[in-house]
Amino acid sequence: MEYKVEDVSPVKKKVNVTVPVEEVDAALGAAIAMYRTSVNLDGFRKGKVPASIVENRFRKEIYAEATQDLVNVHINEIVTSLEVSPLSRIDFDGGELERGKEFSYTISFEVMPQFDLPDYEGFAVEQEKAVVDEKEVDEVIARIRRNMAELVPVAETRPGADGDVVVLDFAAFENGEPIEGVSAENFQLSLGEKQSLEDFENLVKTIPAGQEAEGPITFPDDFLNPDFAGKTVTMKVKVHAVKERRLPEIDDALAQKAGGFESMEKMRETVVTSYMQSREQLHKATAQKSMLDKLLKMVDFALPESMVDMYVGNLIEDMRVKMERQGRGLESLGKTPEQLREQVLPEAQQIARSQIFLLAAGRKEAVEVSEQEVDGQLQQLAMRSGQDFDTLKDYYVRNGLIFNLRDRLIADKAMDAIYAKANVTMVDPAPAA
């Protein structure tokens, strides 16, 4: 086999392959021999059918398989020799093997762009210090205290007010007919917390315990359920009870009951530690992104179309899932598939640029990701999605997604590696506006 490489672009290669007659005939002979071992034909023992009969009877299948097997062998040899890893599906352009004839075909595929990494060792970057204000801790304790409050019926007969909890029944009607799915009994509503529509809450605030009333409720135009968006209905409400919160004392007993802390001081320390850890991670990620954005401006390389397309698809799929959680579909955005692609394309291109840069840095820093680390990431994905780990892993392997997952882990490690070599200055947080 001989081949000639043509660089179609900085990220796409085309390989013209020529296969001599001897290799063609050998490939066909091997395929026929494989068929002979398993084929069953009347009048012949298994494995004893003459090769010529097998070839004539199963010519279409044999020649197709021989062509595919031979091309696959060549592809492995070519990409190994070129020391490249195809990013995209390898496109094959050619016919089928013919006995006694030379065979020519072409393959094309995309590869990572080649570029020189900028010098990132000692790169100046600022990272904001993690700071936790005592007022923030007080707010957390106040929320915990409020959540653990005892609900006590109010002594006087009055409508509910902000801060109260109202127990009620409600049902929606349109043209005098009940609307299916918009009703509940003994529903607990915390007033003043924007848990419900403003019209509904205003109506509830006019009804004392033991009484009922009705009024018009208008759903906003962007309501999650498109069937009700912008619609006005009649809501009938019966209030069973109005309750107020009796807050517990802020003491060691509250800390013990809230989370098994030995004291309120220990509880406050835990809140501070949790806030500090999350903010340190957030500020580090922000500084890393700032550093990466600056480094990306120092290089220029072409983007593989297949890689950008993959991220476009991922972003649109994320958008679809988010819309479904809101009870809506992508079509509710009023955009064509082409418009959606145009909308997410800049972000997809930026993700691709970042990924390519970090994978190149990962090679320079000799970053490695073990199979155990990949499995660990899959375990987390399985737990979040409620899927079986083995089923999920098999899906990732069969669809080639395992390599994308591995590359993401390499990119994450590479970011940490180059950030560790940066000149990081810790700065005070900017004053709140």
Swiss-Prot record:
Under the cellular component aspect of Gene Ontology, which terms does the record hold? cytoplasm
Stored InterPro entries: PPIase_dom_sf, Trig_fac, Trigger_fac_C, Trigger_fac_C_sf, Trigger_fac_ribosome-bd_bac, Trigger_fac_ribosome-bd_sf, Trigger_fact/SurA_dom_sf
Q: Which reaction does it catalyse?
A: [protein]-peptidylproline (omega=180) = [protein]-peptidylproline (omega=0)
Indicate whether Signal appears among the record's keywords: no
EC numbers: 5.2.1.8
Q: Which compartments does it reside in? A: Cytoplasm
**Keyword Isomerase in record:** yes
Pinpoint the PPIase FKBP-type domain residues.
Answer: 163-248
Recite the UniProt keywords alphabetically.
Answer: Cell cycle, Cell division, Chaperone, Cytoplasm, Isomerase, Rotamase
GO MF assignments: peptidyl-prolyl cis-trans isomerase activity; protein folding chaperone; ribosome binding
Query: What does the UniProt function comment say about this protein?
Result: Involved in protein export. Acts as a chaperone by maintaining the newly synthesized protein in an open conformation. Functions as a peptidyl-prolyl cis-trans isomerase.
Q: Which PANTHER family match?
A: TRIGGER FACTOR CHAPERONE AND PEPTIDYL-PROLYL CIS/TRANS ISOMERASE, TRIGGER FACTOR-LIKE PROTEIN TIG, CHLOROPLASTIC
Which family, according to the similarity comment? Belongs to the FKBP-type PPIase family. Tig subfamily.
Under NCBIfam families, the record lists: tig (TIGR00115)
What does the entry's domain section say? Answer: Consists of 3 domains; the N-terminus binds the ribosome, the middle domain has PPIase activity, while the C-terminus has intrinsic chaperone activity on its own.
Put simply, this protein is called Trigger factor
